[in-house]
Amino acid sequence: MFRIKLFYIYILLFFTFETMFLASCSTDKFVPDGSYLLDKVELRSDAADFNASQLAQYVRQKENSRWFSFFKIPLGTYSLAGKDTTKWINRTLQRIGEKPVYYDTLQARLSCEDLRLAMNNMGYMNARVDFSTKVRGKKLKAIYTLMPGEPFMIDNFTYDIQDSTIANILKPTLSQGINTARPHQFTVAALDNERKRITKILNDQGYYRFNKDYIYYTADSIRGSRGVNVTLHLTKYRTIDTAKPTLHPRYMIGKVNIIPGDSTGLHLRRSIIADNTLIEPGKYFSATDLQTTYNNFARLGAIRYTDIEFKEMPQFDSVAINRIFDYTPPSFRFLEANIKLSHTKPNTVAFQPEGTNTAGDLGAAAILTYQNRNLFHGSELFSIELRAAFEAIKGLEGYSNHNYEEYGVQAKLQFPRFLSPFSTREFRRRSNAVSELSVGWDFQDRPEFHRRVFSAAWKYNWSNIRRHLNYELEVPDLSYVYMPWISERFKADYLDNVSNRNAILRYNYEDLFIMRSGFSVAYNRNDNIAIKAKIESAGNLLSMTNSIAKFKKNEQGQAKIFNIAYAQYLKFDFSFTRILRFDPRNSLALHTDFGIAYPYGNSKVLPFEKRYIAGGPNSVRGWSVRELGPGSFRGTDGRIDFINQTGDLKLNLSSEYRTHLFWKFDGAAFVDAGNIWTLRKYADQTGGQFTFSKFLKQMAVSYGLGLRLNFDYFILRFDAGMKAIDPAYSSGRRHYPIVHPKFSRDFTFHFAVGLPF
């Protein structure tokens, strides 16, 4: 019944989009006489090496927006509305649609001038713009042909700095600026970047009142050539009440005051405030230190906001401080820094009920969380989470109990600094780091077995904001899995029966100890490029200890510590995401996800929770979670095999075209490809082992459409995927369902929170 309903929903959506598309084709019938609908704007260039599309922002009139860069559905929706705005349907169609854009000759002329000036600013001083139109019925195509010509280049770049102190500060850095040893195009952007570079250097060297407006240029071009001689001038300091220009004043920090933001006071240790404050008496004023101080306090959970004000100290105070620091006036002036801190409530309690549905088994869960944001008066974040869950399991026969119960407790303690005996104070102040200790204990009681899991971890997280990098180091991370009871029925059916022997299955229901460490690095630049790599290993330290201490071994020949076999493996994960933005409404997201894990030494099989799975809302979306792979393997009777459909290697390739529809709704069209494989040959995973000669043929492919409800702070995602190539079948109609689609067999619906990548 559910499949049938989804089929009708699919048909309804198809005809809805088809109707709106047809409506968009007839929008010109509402164009007034003497006017033209601006159907398309095209930017061209007569120079092959000049990208005309980069200047699209200077065109004042844009055509109506398109879904997926092709379909003018918003315009078609607006055109479906009648003129009677008293009717609800007409107002609704106009609100979610888009008004037609009519060609305006004045806006076209102004756009030509804006485009010419933009090319001038890029160094094309002889640029021209040719404008033409093509009319078809009541629709008009506007064509802007850019003729940039040859760019002007900087032949000679000199500095005119009359302040000798500033000149000496800048001299070692001149090679980082506009250097005529390398060719530089004569662009406004290059000249402005040089102003910003110099301003930043001086702002970090005590020049508190300096800004880039004190820098200007003069340029001289030689007649008949495209070479330009440029001189940078740095003017003297001038105030409103001082007619005569003077040397730029240089400021030092004379005094720092910490001011609580409310009457209750901020209960932070002095050492914590000092470690996070880079503004100190006796140091030059530095804009970078100011921003770092803001960033440091923003990381402290005990502080709600920070406000830092500077005021120039009176002359008599400056004289006194000069004597203390052995400086002579008027070489320096002094600033008094007032740092106002306002703290948050230290204690919070949260309760979160949940409803669960695991393969049709209904249940409920509840989470109670307590947080203290200032445990030791150092803005340490302590949290303890209590979780309880209950689920009624259907379809089990031969078991005395049919309920699943879980109780867990997890405690975390975060320190907003790098806690290590080897780190320097300066590194701790600038590293933007967090150290975290976590301990957890989980009780799981199922009809088939009881499981107890103890975990403990110590990790560091720090970032380099300027380079858009984030690092995480886990040393160590401990997991102890204990199976106090396994049902005799479960043993007989799955673990002891010769016909069902499975190394992966047995290994998953044995006591296990994992001692691992890991390191990851993530790069994220302006939401356009994201790269993440992680490597982790387990059991190596224990293996070295075993070579000396000679641990006892179990029946499978595995070394044991505390009478439990330990896991040993190496794992590497890598992901890359690239977002190509065509316009404010349309973008293309490309994603690659690769992972490999190799068990060795004391382990023949990877721990179950470390194995890869395929399918689901964040993988190949034509399949449900765990429904795909490994390789060409397919579950018994076409059913999902929870244990066997896991692997040691994964590869996912995805492309998703994203478009804004209307209001909070976004749409997507996607193509996914990928699978998982095992590195070793297992009897119960036929066709699952990775080989270079077969893996391309075993890549699953799916396609589909998605609808997203974007509330900015979270996104609800609905994806409908269809199988295109199914590696579980080597040939025939089932191998290429894209040619012979069957909705009840090939369709998969996903609901998730957040984007897939």
Where in this protein do the model-derived segments appear?
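Extracytoplasmic gating/loop element in the C-terminal half of outer-membrane beta-barrel translocons
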Residues: 587-670, 678-682
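Outer-membrane beta-barrel "beta-signal"
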Residues: 709-713, 743-757
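Repeated loop/turn-to-beta-strand initiation elements of outer-membrane beta-barrel proteins
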Residues: 303-306, 346-349, 374-382, 417-423, ...
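Outer-membrane beta-barrel initiation region
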Residues: 242-428, 508-515, 523, 527, ...
